[in-house]
A protein has these predicted regions:
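Extended, structured, electrostatic nucleic-acid-contact surfaces
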Residues: 3-11, 202-227, 235-238
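Gly/Thr-rich phosphate-binding beta-strand-loop-beta motif of the actin/hexokinase/Hsp70
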Residues: 7-28, 104
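Nucleic-acid-processing active sites and adjacent nucleic-acid-binding tracks
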Residues: 31-55
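Short alpha-helix plus adjacent loop in nuclease-associated cores
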Residues: 80-119, 123, 127, 168-170, ...
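Glycine-rich, often acidic, oxyanion-interacting loops/wings at catalytic, nucleic-acid
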Residues: 129-220
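Phosphate-backbone recognition surface of nucleic-acid-processing proteins
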Residues: 220-223, 229-312
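Low-complexity, acidic/Ser/Thr- and charged residue-rich accessory regions of DNA metabolism proteins
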Residues: 266, 304-344
Length: 344
């Protein structure tokens, strides 16, 4: 059994297995060591935990966990959300609600690294970013769909979204006489949906920027080269508490911008970057790296890495550096500034 003396500030240590209807709550009294493992209906969870003193509560960082964490914090409890992959090794028995709740408890007392609990503003930014990503995906799918259909009628559309928007109306109108009216009408409807998506994306982006600019480090992130409004919004959510990452390198590794390595017998081999990461933010950072590489104001370090490494490797290296710089400005609470070059 874990040493409970280190948790003497809490009345109980609790592990909760979240569900849609019935929650499983595993608790241990820090004074007596008494253990309970009971089911509680969803609408009774807050009531059952309202009058049990200050508790340390652990939950898996899964769907609705942020909501429950804020509700439990409002009751005066301390809440730690933990990555489900880190909790799984602590589940000792066959899969069941009781075993899951017990596993969450053991992960909690073992000191598994916690995920930050988002504020309501951070939650709203995250939700809007998710909505924006879906709209961008839908818009891209529709554009490619229209581009493929128009190619069957001899029209080759430009790759740029702006150029596509300027040319597509003319191409659809030129189909008069070459295609049946239903084809033309359907293409026009699809193009209208594309424009509607673009308008919604712009509306979401304005609100995302407005909310993100209310956060503490928004203006600091925008001083980092290559960081724009969208990356800044992601960083405001992810680095609201930069101390959850022990170093800039750990943050870059979390984003999948550090290559994996393997080996044994004293020989280590560096391989590709991992696939399990925040791919949306990593993609945006790589896009920012491309923009920085094209900039006339790029630093000497960027010029050197572009000259020495293959282009894609260089882009990941620049994105890695951007992520580290974002962590640094969030940790220090100050703008990014270029380090002066000193003579040897």
């Amino acid at each position: 059994m874990a040493n409970l003396n280190q948790f003497c500030d809490f009345t109980k240590l609790i592990g909760i297995d979240i569900a849609k209807s019935v929650f499983q709550i595993y608790s241990c009294d820090t004074q007596t060591g008494e253990i309970t493992n009971m089911q509680v209906k969803r609408d009774k969870v807050l009531e059952s935990l309202a009058n049990c003193g200050k508790c340390l509560i652990g939950m898996e960082a899964c769907g609705s966990s942020q909501y429950w964490a804020r509700k439990l914090q409002a009751l005066g409890h301390t809440v730690r959300l933990m990555d489900t992959k880190l909790v799984k090794p602590f589940v000792r028995h066959n899969k069941s609600d009781k075993a899951d709740a017990e596993g969450v408890y053991h992960a909690l007392v073992s000191g598994v690294r916690a995920v930050a609990v988002k504020t309501e503003t951070e939650r709203d930014i995250q939700t809007l970013l998710t909505m924006r990503a879906l709209l961008v995906k839908q818009r891209t799918a529709r554009i490619n769909h229209v581009r493929g259909l128009l190619a069957e009628y001899g029209h080759v559309m430009p790759k740029s979204v702006d150029q596509f928007d300027k040319k597509v109306d003319e191409c659809i109108n030129s189909l008069e006489g070459d295609a049946v009216q239903l084809v033309i009408d359907t293409l026009r409807d699809t193009f209208k949906s594309i424009r509607d998506d673009q308008d919604r994306i712009k509306t979401l982006q304005r609100e995302i920027s407005r909310l993100a600019n209310q956060t503490r480090n928004a203006k600091h992130f925008l001083t980092v080269p290559g960081v724009g409004e969208t990356i800044m919004a992601y960083m405001c959510v992810l680095l609201a508490d930069p101390t959850q990452f022990s170093s800039a390198r750990q943050f870059a590794a979390y984003l999948g911008l550090v290559p994996m390595h393997t080996g044994s017998g004293g020989k280590t081999v560096t391989t590709k970057i991992p696939g399990q990461c925040d791919k949306a933010l990593r993609a945006l950072l790589v896009q920012g790296a491309h923009a920085m590489a094209r900039s006339k104001c790029r630093t000497d370090w960027v010029k050197t890495i572009l000259a020495k490494k293959p282009k894609k490797v260089a882009m990941v290296a620049i994105a890695n550096r951007m992520a580290r710089q974002c962590w640094a400005v969030a940790s220090k609470g100050q703008d990014w500034r270029r380090m002066p070059v000193t003579a040897a």
